[in-house]
Amino acid sequence: MIYFSRKLVAIIVVIFAQSSLGTNAIQVNSQSLGQNGYVKYSNGLLIQWGKQPGSTASTVTIYLPTSFYDTNYVIHGCIIKDAYDENVYTATSLVNPTVSSFKMDRNFGSSSGTGVSRAKYSWMAIGRWK
């Protein structure tokens, strides 16, 4: 019984060491879980998201919460329409993406012609950070 606690600690250390062998689990490296946020994973994957408030400018620059490694990332977004909005929107054109920002074209078409949208915009970007 004298060495019971030492043996117990040794057994726990051995079990922990064996359970960690061959583990390829992807860990969260850092994160910011706000409305405009990101999650960085240990394998280099970076997922970012955010919302852009309405604007009357035809092109709006959206600054990413953190920078990507390069410009080979994908952006997906959607217009958040008001109930009375009868305009027609297509995929939003993206202009000159950089590692820390992208520009979004806010034009639309309607039965009375074309114009600049004041609608809110929600987006998500996926790429790498290392």
Please report, for each region that a protein language model flagged, where it lies by residue.
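Short, intrinsically disordered N-terminal pre-domain segments
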Residues: 2-11, 124, 128-130
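Extracellular attachment/recognition segments
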Residues: 34, 38, 42-130
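Glycine-rich, low-complexity segments
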Residues: 4-47
